[in-house]
Amino acid sequence: MGAASEESKVTARQFRKLALSLPDAIESEHMGHPDFRVGGKIFATLNFEETFCVLMLTPEQQNDWLNRAPQRFKPCKGAWGLRGCTQVELTTATAPTLRQALKMAWTNKAPKE
């Protein structure tokens, strides 16, 4: 599979809508770029140009996504990537895939009851 079709690729606006649809999610800012938090913890960010997002996955979740969709997901550079931080190019992502991965990142950071 190549890049997502023009009709299905995710825009920064759609990404925001998906992230903010999760319970208690808010948009904030970290080092000058948008981030998305739950319970005060960042679960996702957008880069300055809003062309890709970073999801705070576990290393196991990251590995699963890299195996399932290597053309869409890649580890962040350095120690962050080793911890599970995963970059997703919005132009290659589809809403259903991104929704599922965002939910994982949100669950990782959401307050435990």
Language-model-derived ranges and their functions:
Residues 1-113:
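Charge-dense, helix-prone N-terminal extensions
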